[in-house]
Every structure is written in C-alpha cells, then in structure tokens.
Regions:
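A conserved acidic beta->alpha catalytic loop
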Residues: 39-48, 95
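Donor nucleotide-sugar binding loop of glycosyltransferases
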Residues: 17-20, 42, 69
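Short, well-formed alpha-helical segments that are part of the catalytic scaffolds
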Residues: 16-30
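Acceptor/aglycone-binding surface of glycosyltransferases and processive sugar-polymer synthases
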Residues: 64-79, 99-172
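Short beta-strand-to-loop acidic/aromatic patch adjacent to the donor-nucleotide binding site
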Residues: 85-96
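Short hydrophobic beta-strand elements that form part
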Residues: 9-13, 62
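Short beta-strand/loop segment that forms part of the nucleotide-sugar
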Residues: 25, 33-42, 61-63
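Cell-envelope/extracellular polymer assembly enzymes that use nucleotide-activated donors
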Residues: 7-9, 34
C-alpha cells in the first residue's frame, strides 16, 4: 500500500467517560484526523455529552447493549472500513493517553502499514486506584505469559491496519 492509499481515522470507544473525553477531544482533534466516537451503551446523560461533541470531523456511532470495548471497537472498525479507511488509531476516552503522540503513531503506521503500532502511556498522572488496577492486570498477564517485562498490557493508544485486523476478528 502506498502513502496515497493510506487513510486513517481515530476511533474512541466510550462508556462512562464522556466528561474526560470532552476535555481531551480538542487535543485529539489537533492531529488533523477525523474522529469516530463509539457510544458503547452509555446512560442518557453520557450520550447527551457525546452528542454535544458532534462537529464536521467528529461523529458518534451508537452501539446498543453495551457488549464491551472489544465489540465496540469491532463495530467501529467495520464502519471505518466501509467508509474506505485503511487504518484506525484507537485512543481510550479516559484521558490517560497522550493525544500529542498521535502524529508520531501516524508516522510509524505509514512506515509499517501492515503492523499494529502500540504506544506506551504516561502513568505519572494516573490516580492511585487506577494505577494499582493496571499493576494487578500487568502482573497476571505476566504470570499467564511467563514474562515479567510488560510495559502496558492494556494499551489505550494503538494504530490498527484495518484489513488485517478485521480478517483476524472475523476468524474468531
């Protein structure tokens, strides 16, 4: 695939994080990419906040039933693919990822168009409870994998090549 065929969009799965997303969205939009927010079964109040974020380059897709982040991402991936996008940059709605890293992720994705690109979060701004929850998750993932050096088992900023990702998703 040449750079001329490379088309990326940002997908943000959102459940119970509409307020932090509203604060982070201007930083995310600074990347210059369009944004698809996947409303993953939010309350009416949270959905109203998401609706207030609509703009020419921001859309909200409703994913009913709140089946979880993975299903919300697949829903968003399939929509993006149907719109001709080749890559999706996924960033979590909770504001823990550095949106200013999106251009760097984009450059890497353009160089390595068939590879999944994962960022590393900055844990300095994370509340203690969330830090501990991540640490416990990392610990058990390391135990399961037999490895101790896991930087982020729950990476919230990635770039997916859509065709390959959807092919794997449809096999399972």
């Amino acid at each position: 695939m040449s750079d001329l065929n490379f088309r990326a969009v940002i997908i943000i799965p959102c459940r119970k994080h509409a307020r932090p997303l509203a604060l982070e969205l201007p930083k995310i939009l600074a990347s210059g990419l369009g944004v698809i927010i996947v409303d993953d079964g939010n309350t009416v109040e949270e959905s109203q906040i998401l609706n207030s974020l609509l703009a020419p380059n921001v859309m909200v897709l409703r994913h009913t039933g709140a089946p979880g982040k993975g299903a919300a991402m697949q829903f968003g991936f399939e929509y993006a693919y149907s719109q001709g996008f080749t890559h999706v940059i996924q960033i979590d709605a909770d504001g823990q990822q550095d949106a200013q890293a999106i251009p760097e992720i984009l450059v890497l994705a353009m160089r390595h168009q068939n590879q999944l690109i994962c960022a590393v979060p900055n844990y300095n701004k994370v509340p203690l409870g969330r830090f501990m929850a991540r640490y416990i998750t990392h610990f058990w993932v390391a135990v399961e994998l037999g490895r101790c050096q896991i930087i982020d088992s729950m990476c919230g900023l990635r770039c997916y090549p859509l065709a390959q990702t959807l092919q794997v998703m449809h096999q399972h």
